[in-house]
From Swiss-Prot:
One of the protein's GO biological processes: pyrimidine ribonucleoside biosynthetic process
Residues reported in the UniProt entry to bind 5-phospho-alpha-D-ribose 1-diphosphate: 29, 75-76, 101-102, 105, 107, 126-134
Cofactor needs: Mg(2+)
Assembly and binders: Homodimer.
Reactions catalysed according to its record: orotidine 5'-phosphate + diphosphate = orotate + 5-phospho-alpha-D-ribose 1-diphosphate
EC number: 2.4.2.10
Taxonomic lineage: Bacteria, Pseudomonadati, Pseudomonadota, Betaproteobacteria, Burkholderiales
Binding sites annotated in the UniProt record for orotate: 37-38, 130, 158
Organism: Ralstonia pickettii (strain 12J)
GO CC annotation, single: cytoplasm
HAMAP family, alphabetized: PyrE
UniProt keyword terms in alphabetical order: Glycosyltransferase, Magnesium, Pyrimidine biosynthesis, Transferase
The protein's name in its UniProt record: Orotate phosphoribosyltransferase
Enzyme class name: transferase
Family membership: Belongs to the purine/pyrimidine phosphoribosyltransferase family. PyrE subfamily.
């Protein structure tokens, strides 16, 4: 197993142990019944956030993406980007980070942007990509500041076609972002990594979900990027 594969599998195990990745029967916003659910909101204490940031930082450095700073879209991305900046500094790569407010301030420092000045090549840090709205808004803010969106860094790529339970699109939200903005989307792990985890988990309680996850992948999944 390569170092990258080990990192991906370590993240899946970590997410399961933290209760962030759970198995069962869940209805997604698209109306599809999924055998797994990923809830990044459960990374809710200092120790968990610190570990997540390490996964983000190592994945970004391993990706080969050239970057100068990080951007965290409000609201989840704010914490994720700032924690990742701390982790990067600990690994010897000190970069600035910025984030946006949902509503611009008209007092104090004012404006909708907080943190380091947006400049150079900027990596957008978020949890997942669903409809791509957060990415679009981030790209617009970064370009308006005269900087260049370099990549999007996310926790989990569901590798799932857009649409709903009946109308199934040709591409995933991640593929749409890559095609529209011409920049890579780097994920710590994806659905194939989840299937690999279930293959090797050795837990009878999880064995039944391997077949369900594979069937879900066959019905709604896209090819690996």
């Amino acid at each position: 197993m390569s170092q990258n594969s080990e990192l991906r599998q370590s993240f899946i195990r970590f997410a399961v142990e933290a209760g962030v990745l759970s198995f069962g029967e869940f209805v997604t916003k698209a109306g599809r019944t999924s055998p797994y659910f990923f809830n990044a909101g459960k990374f809710a204490d200092g120790a968990l956030l610190g570990q997540v940031a390490q996964f983000y930082a190592k994945t970004l450095l391993d990706s080969g993406v050239e970057f100068d700073m990080l951007f965290g879209p409000a609201y989840k991305g704010i914490t994720l980007a700032s924690a990742t900046a701390v982790a990067l500094a600990g690994l010897g790569r000190n970069v600035g980070f910025a984030y946006n407010r949902k509503e611009a301030k008209d007092h104090g420092e004012g404006g909708s942007l907080v943190g380091a000045k947006l400049q150079g090549r900027v990596v957008i840090v978020d949890d997942v990509i669903s409809a791509g709205t957060s990415v679009r808004e981030s790209v617009e803010l970064i370009r308006a500041a005269g900087a260049t969106p370099a990549a999007v860094l996310i926790l989990m790529d569901r590798m799932e076609r857009s649409g709903n339970a009946v109308d199934i699109g040709e591409r995933s939200a991640v593929q749409d972002v890559q095609a529209q903005y011409g920049m890579p989307v780097v994920s710590i792990a994806n659905l194939d990594d989840l299937l690999g985890y279930l293959d090797n988990a050795g837990d009878p309680a999880l064995a039944g979900y391997r077949e369900k996850a594979a069937a879900y992948r066959d019905k709604y999944g896209v090819s690996a990027i």
